[in-house]
Structure formats: structure tokens, C-alpha cells
Regions:
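General beta-strand structural signal in soluble alpha/beta enzymes
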Residues: 5, 34, 65-67, 116-120
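Active-site loop/lid in soluble adenylation, ligation, and acyl-transfer enzymes
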Residues: 1-52, 56
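Catalytic micro-motifs at enzyme active sites that drive phosphoryl/nucleotidyl and oxygen chemistry
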Residues: 70-74, 114, 120-122
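Active-site cofactor/substrate anionic-group-binding motifs, chiefly glycine-
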Residues: 52-74
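Residues forming anionic-ligand binding surfaces in small-molecule and nucleic-acid pockets
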Residues: 69-89
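A generic, well-ordered mixed alpha/beta core segment in the N-terminal half of proteins
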Residues: 84-120
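Conserved small/polar residues in nucleotide/adenosyl-binding loops
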Residues: 124-126
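Short coil/turn connectors at secondary-structure junctions
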Residues: 27-31, 37-39, 60-63, 79-81, ...
Length: 126
């Protein structure tokens, strides 16, 4: 497994790096990537941006808005949260078991004394 840690806080750069890793490694290698963004709203592939954000607030506060290549809901990022990406070689039958990606992270956090737990499909709550 490859491990990458992005030094960039630029959300466009980090999403491009994520896509580059996916395109270059493809089905050959697994990769775990850690990254942070400056103040950003990341919207899912199929979301209507204007329905997901308060454009006046976003402009007034200098918040960047970017779209990721995958689906899912809109999320807010800033330097107070750490994002992780798994690029995995194989999904059994095309089905993704998100808990298999979250479980090692939760286990590592618990070993450090952080009371983490998995909620829902892919949410880690602390």
C-alpha cells in the first residue's frame, strides 16, 4: 500500500491529486492519502451547488466551493479536520463496504485514546 500526505491546503489541488492517484495506480495498488483543506465546501458529483450552499455567506467569508468526482453529500472542510482517501484495488462484486475503510481508522484512533465510532455508512464520530 502506498501512503501519501498532501502538504497543500488547496482543495482543487487535493482533489486533483486524489484523481491522479486513482488514474495512475488504478487496479494495481492500494493507496491511503491524508490531506487538509482551507475553508471549503465540497459538493458531490450529482448535487446542485446553488441548492447546497448559501452563496452570499460563501462569498462574504471567502469559502472555496469545489465539486468532487464521487457522489455523496456536501461537506465543509477547514484546517480543523483531517481528510483521508483510500484508493483500493478491488471491491467484491462491485459493492463497497465503507466500514472496511473506516474500521482501521477508528481502531487507530481508539488506540490513541480517542473515543471514535462508526455511524452510518461512512461517518466517523468522535
Amino acid at each position: 500500500m502506498y501512503y501519501l500526505e498532501s502538504a497543500s491546503m488547496d482543495p482543487a489541488w487535493n482533489l486533483a491529486l486524489e484523481q491522479f492517484v486513482f488514474d495512475q495506480l488504478g487496479p494495481r495498488e492500494d493507496c491511503f492519502m491524508l490531506w487538509q483543506n482551507d475553508r471549503t465546501i465540497v459538493v458531490g458529483k450529482y448535487q446542485n451547488v446553488l441548492e447546497e450552499i448559501n452563496s452570499t455567506y460563501v462569498k462574504e467569508h471567502g469559502i472555496t466551493v469545489v465539486r468532487r468526482l464521487s457522489g455523496g453529500g456536501a461537506v465543509y472542510h477547514d484546517r480543523g479536520n483531517l481528510n483521508f482517501t483510500f484508493v483500493a484495488r478491488d471491491c467484491q462484486g462491485g459493492m463497497i463496504d465503507f466500514s472496511s475503510f473506516c474500521r482501521p481508522v477508528v481502531d487507530a484512533l481508539r488506540e490513541m485514546g480517542v473515543p471514535a465510532q462508526i455511524n452510518g455508512l461512512s461517518l466517523i464520530h468522535i
